[in-house]
Swiss-Prot record:
Binding site for ATP: 515-523, 537
UniProt-recorded name of the protein: G-type lectin S-receptor-like serine/threonine-protein kinase At1g11300
EC code: 2.7.11.1
Organism ancestry: Eukaryota, Viridiplantae, Streptophyta, Embryophyta, Tracheophyta
Domain (Protein kinase): residue spans on this chain: 509-788
Catalytic activity from the UniProt record: L-seryl-[protein] + ATP = O-phospho-L-seryl-[protein] + ADP + H(+); L-threonyl-[protein] + ATP = O-phospho-L-threonyl-[protein] + ADP + H(+)
Length: 820
C-alpha cells in the first residue's frame, strides 16, 4: 500500500500559486465566531471564496463547504460533512462550547467537527476564511491555528495546501479522495497522494481494490515528473524548494501564476487540473491523467514497455520474451516478459564476456528505483558490479537510479522521458551489433535485383501502353460492376469527360483553382465551356488511397439521389489519370465557417439548426431510405459542403461501405478516417456500423453549437463536464445564443451527447435523432458518459486526408481543409 511507503522526513507542501494578488493575512481575513444558518455564508476578504451550506448539482442534500465565489460556475473545493448530508435547511455551522467548529442538523446532532483538543471556549475561538481558500480555526487572541482545512483536503488541491507527509511529527500522508458522483461528495473510489520515497511521485489509488496503484507520475527531478504524457510534459513547470528546518518542508510553485487554477480528483479516477478562462467564463482542462491506456499501472507487466502510438501497445524489452506466449498474443500482457539469457553472475559458469547495457531512449522510468549520488559512468559501473542490478539511469536532478528485482510500468515517450540502461548478457548485445551489416548486405543485393526488374518491366509496359489506353475505362467499370453487383450498363451512363476538357476548365489544374486536398488527391474548381461550375477531384499518384476509393465512390454515389448529398456529374479515365467531377459548392464546407470567429457570424442559430436537420436527413437516406445501406465512415465538418442557399450536402464517399441487408456491423483491419470523429469501437477495434456514423454526427452537432473543434476529444470532455454542472449555456457559441431558441439549443446539445456515448448500443439511430429533432419524441433519455479517446490511444490508422493545413499524429489526421 503506497500510503505507508513514505520514509522521507520532509513535509511536502504543494504551492500551486495561481492567484493574481499577493496580500497579507490581515487583508484576507473574514471572521465568524457565532453561528451560520443554512442561508448565511462568509466570504473571504477579496471575495475569492465563500463558506456556508450548498447543494451539489442534481441534489437537494445540504452540505457545509467552501467554493469559489469569484467564478460563475459552482466549484466546490472542500466539504465538511461529506458523508453525512442534511436533508433540509435546518443545518447550522457554529463554534461549540469546547471551542471546536461543528456542523449540526435540526435535531442538534453533530455531523462534523474539527475535533481538536483545546483549552479555549466558544467565546475565545473564531473561524476565519482566508483568500487562499483555507478555512482556519484559531484563538481570537493569537495568530496560531488550532485547525485548518488545508491539512484536511477532500477532493481538491489548492495553492499552499499540504499534500505530503510529516514523518518527524508522526503525520501520515495527506490525500485527496474523489466524490462518489457529481451529486454525492461522500468518499468515492479513488485517492491521490504525493508519496515521498526515493523520489517524490504522485499516485492515484483505487480504494475498492486494497489501495492498488492506478497511475503513477514517475519521479520528480526538480522541474517535472518524468512519466507525464508528452502532451503534458510542460504542465508541471514547478520548482522544489527544500527547507532543512526543524520540521522539514518541500514546496512547489508555479512558474506562471497569472491563471486561476486548482487540481481535483475526479470521481472516474482522473486527476484533473482546471484552469479558469476569462474569455469563456468557464473552467478548461489543463491536464488530465491517466491520459492514455499506457498510463494504466503495470499495463504490460514486467520487463516490457508500453507505447500508445503502436499496435499492439506492449512489447518485450530486447533480450526478454513473453512469459506466456499464448496469452501475450491474445492481448493479455499482464504476465509480462522474462529474460532469455541469464546475466553473467547468474550462470553456473560465469566465465566469458561481461554483461553490457541496452539503451532505451526517452522512457518513463520504471517503478521502485533506488537512489545514489554517483556520476553516470560510476552509476553504470556500479550496476555491472552488483549482481542484483538489472537497470540504471542517470539524469539532472535524479542522480543515479538503480533497479533491482524487476522493471514495471515503463513507457516509451516521444518527446520527454529519460534514457534507461537495461543490463543484458553479452550475447544479447552482440546480436544487435551484427544486424546493420546483415541488413546492409540484404539491401545492396535487393537494390540490384529491383533495379533489374524495373528496367525489364519498363520495356514491357512501354510496349503494352498503347494497347492498354483503349481499355482503361472498361477496366474501371468492370471493377465497379464487381463491387456493386449491379447494372454495369446503367453505371456506364455516367458521363465520361475528356482530360483536355477538365484541364481547360481548371486552367490546367492551376494552384489558383485548387480548393483543398484530400486522401484521394487535390480538388480543383473548374468551369465548363457552357458555364457550369464544377469541382474536380484528381487522383494523386502519391496518395495512400486512390483507385480503390475512386471505384468505391463511383459505386456508392452513382446510385444515390438526395438533396443533402453532393451530386456526381461524371468522371475522367485517361491513361494514368483518374478524376471525379462534382457539382460545385460555392459556400465551401461547414468547417470553413464554424471555426473562424469572423465567418461564424454568418451562421445564425436558425441556419445552423437547418444544417443539422439537413445532415441528419442525408445520413438517414444513406442508412435506411436508399436502395443501399451505406456507412459513410468519414463524416466530419469538412465533408459537409454548403450550396449557395447554405443547404448542407454530405460529400466524400471514398471510404464508404455498402452493407448487405442482413448485416448490422462489420470489422476491418484497415482503420481509416479522421481523428476526433471516429467512434471508439472503430478507432480501437476496426468495428463499424450505423452507430459509428452516429458518433461522428454527434461530434458535428456539438461543433456546430459550440463553434469549437473536437481536438484530442477535449470538446466531448468539456461538454460532459458542463452538462453535469448544469452550465450548458456556457458551451453555446455567443454568436448564436438567443433566449428565444434556448430550449431548442439545449435539446440539440442533449441529442449530441446521446450520439457520442461510449457504448455503440446506447447511441440512438439516425431515424431516432431525426424524430427527436422534430419533437416527435418528447421524452429524451439522459446521456451516459461520452467516449474520451486520447490521441495516443488510437492505433495507427490511415488518414482520410493529407494537407499542408494539418496536424498529423499517429497517422490519424486533424484536418483543416477549406472545402471543395
Amino acid at each position: 500500500m503506497r500510503l505507508h511507503e513514505s520514509s522521507s522526513p520532509f513535509v511536502c507542501i504543494l504551492v500551486l500559486s495561481c492567484f493574481f494578488l499577493s496580500v497579507s493575512l490581515a487583508q484576507e481575513r473574514a471572521f465568524f465566531s457565532g453561528k451560520l444558518n443554512d442561508s448565511e455564508t462568509i466570504v473571504s476578504s477579496f471575495r475569492t471564496f465563500r463558506f456556508g451550506f450548498f447543494s451539489p448539482v442534481n441534489s437537494t442534500s445540504r452540505y457545509a463547504g467552501i467554493w469559489y465565489n469569484s467564478v460563475s460556475v459552482q466549484t466546490v473545493i472542500w466539504v465538511a460533512n461529506k458523508d453525512k448530508p442534511i436533508n433540509d435547511s435546518s443545518g447550522v455551522i457554529s463554534v461549540s462550547q469546547d471551542g471546536n467548529l461543528v456542523v449540526t442538523d435540526g435535531q442538534r446532532r453533530v455531523l462534523w467537527s474539527t475535533n481538536v483538543s483545546t483549552q479555549a471556549s466558544a467565546n475565545s475561538t473564531v473561524a476565519e476564511l482566508l483568500d487562499s481558500g483555507n478555512l482556519v480555526l484559531k484563538e481570537a487572541s493569537s495568530d496560531a491555528y488550532l485547525w485548518e482545512s488545508f491539512k484536511y483536503p477532500t477532493d481538491s488541491w489548492l495553492p499552499n495546501m499540504l499534500v505530503g507527509t510529516n514523518a518527524r511529527i508522526g503525520g501520515g500522508n495527506v490525500t485527496i479522495t474523489s466524490w462518489k458522483s457529481p451529486s454525492d461528495p461522500s468518499p468515492g473510489s479513488y485517492t491521490a497522494a504525493l508519496v515521498l520515497a526515493a523520489y517524490p511521485e504522485l499516485f492515484i489509488m483505487n480504494n475498492n481494490n486494497n489501495n492498488s496503484t492506478v497511475w503513477r507520475s514517475g519521479p520528480w527531478n526538480g522541474q517535472m515528473f518524468n512519466g507525464l504524457p508528452d502532451v503534458y510534459a510542460g504542465v508541471f513547470l514547478y520548482r522544489f524548494i527544500v527547507n532543512d528546518d526543524t520540521n522539514g518542508s518541500v514546496t512547489m510553485s508555479y512558474a506562471n501564476d497569472s491563471t486561476l487554477r486548482y487540481f481535483y480528483m475526479d470521481y472516474r479516477g482522473s486527476v484533473i487540473r482546471r484552469d479558469w478562462s476569462e474569455t469563456r467564463r468557464n473552467w478548461t482542462v489543463g491536464l488530465q491523467v491517466p491520459a492514455t491506456e499506457c498510463d494504466n499501472y503495470r499495463r504490460c507487466g514486467e520487463f516490457a514497455t508500453c507505447n500508445p502510438r503502436k499496435n499492439p501497445l506492449c512489447s518485450c524489452i530486447r533480450g526478454f520474451r513473453p512469459r506466456n506466449l499464448i496469452e501475450w498474443n491474445n492481448g493479455n500482457w499482464s504476465g509480462g516478459c522474462t529474460r532469455r539469457v541469464p546475466l553473467q553472475c547468474e550462470r553456473q559458469n560465469n566465465n566469458g564476456s561481461a554483461d553490457g547495457f541496452l539503451r532505451l531512449r526517452r522512457m518513463k522510468l520504471p517503478d521502485f528505483a533506488r537512489r545514489s549520488e554517483a556520476s553516470e559512468p560510476e552509476c553504470l559501473r556500479t550496476c555491472l558490479q552488483t549482481c542484483s542490478c538489472i537497470a540504471a539511469a542517470h539524469g539532472l536532478g535524479y542522480g543515479c537510479m538503480i533497479w533491482n528485482g524487476s522493471l514495471v510500468d515503463s513507457q516509451e515517450l516521444s518527446a520527454s522521458g529519460l534514457d534507461l540502461y537495461i543490463r543484458l548478457a553479452h550475447s544479447e548485445i552482440k546480436t544487435k551489433d551484427k544486424r546493420p551489416i546483415l541488413i546492409g548486405t540484404i539491401l545492396a543485393g535487393g537494390i540490384f535485383v529491383v533495379a533489374a526488374c524495373v528496367l525489364l518491366a519498363r520495356r514491357i509496359v512501354m510496349k503494352k501502353r498503347a494497347k492498354k489506353k483503349g481499355r482503361d475505362a472498361e477496366q474501371i467499370f468492370e471493377r465497379v460492376e464487381a463491387l456493386a453487383g449491379g447494372n454495369k450498363g446503367k453505371l456506364k451512363e455516367l458521363p465520361l469527360f475528356e482530360f483536355q476538357v477538365l484541364a481547360a476548365a481548371t486552367n490546367n489544374f492551376s494552384l489558383r483553382n485548387k480548393l483543398g486536398q484530400g486522401g484521394f488527391g487535390p480538388v480543383y474548381k473548374g468551369k465548363l465551356q457552357e458555364g457550369q461550375e464544377i469541382a474536380v477531384k484528381r487522383l494523386s499518384r502519391a496518395s495512400g488511397q486512390g483507385l480503390e476509393e475512386l471505384v468505391n465512390e463511383v459505386v456508392v454515389i452513382s446510385k444515390l439521389q438526395h438533396r443533402n448529398l453532393v451530386k456526381l456529374l461524371g468522371c475522367c479515365i485517361a491513361g494514368e489519370e483518374r478524376m471525379l467531377v462534382y457539382e460545385f459548392m460555392p459556400k465551401k464546407s461547414l468547417d470553413y465557417y464554424l471555426f473562424d470567429s469572423r465567418r461564424a457570424k454568418l451562421l445564425d442559430w436558425k441556419t445552423r439548426f437547418n444544417i443539422i436537420n439537413g445532415i441528419c436527413r442525408g445520413l438517414l437516406y444513406l442508412h435506411r431510405d436508399s436502395r443501399l445501406r451505406i456507412i459513410h465512415r468519414d463524416l466530419k465538418a469538412s465533408n459537409i459542403l454548403l450550396d449557395e442557399n447554405l443547404i448542407p450536402k454530405i460529400s466524400d464517399f471514398g471510404l464508404a461501405r455498402i452493407f448487405p441487408g442482413n448485416e448490422d456491423e462489420a470489422n476491418t483491419r484497415r482503420v481509416v478516417g479522421t481523428y476526433g470523429y471516429m467512434a471508439p469501437e472503430y478507432a480501437m477495434g476496426g468495428l463499424f456500423s450505423e452507430k459509428s456514423d452516429v458518433f461522428s454526427l454527434g461530434v458535428i452537432l456539438l461543433e456546430i453549437i459550440s463553434g469549437r473543434r473536437n481536438s484530442n476529444s477535449t470538446l466531448l470532455a468539456y461538454v460532459w463536464s458542463i452538462w453535469n454542472e448544469g452550465e450548458i449555456n456556457s458551451l453555446v457559441d455567443p454568436e448564436i445564443f438567443d433566449l428565444l431558441f434556448e430550449k431548442e439549443i439545449h435539446k440539440c446539445i442533449h441529442i449530441g451527447l446521446l450520439c457520442v456515448q461510449e457504448a455503440a448500443n446506447d447511441r440512438p439511430s439516425v431515424s431516432t435523432v431525426c424524430s427527436m429533432l422534430s419533437s416527435e419524441i418528447a421524452d429524451i433519455p439522459e446521456p451516459k458518459q461520452p467516449a474520451f479517446i486520447s490521441r495516443n490511444n488510437v492505433p495507427e490508422a490511415e488518414s482520410s486526408e493529407n494537407s499542408d493545413l494539418k496536424d498529423s499524429i499517429n497517422n490519424v489526421t486533424i484536418t483543416d481543409v477549406t472545402g471543395r
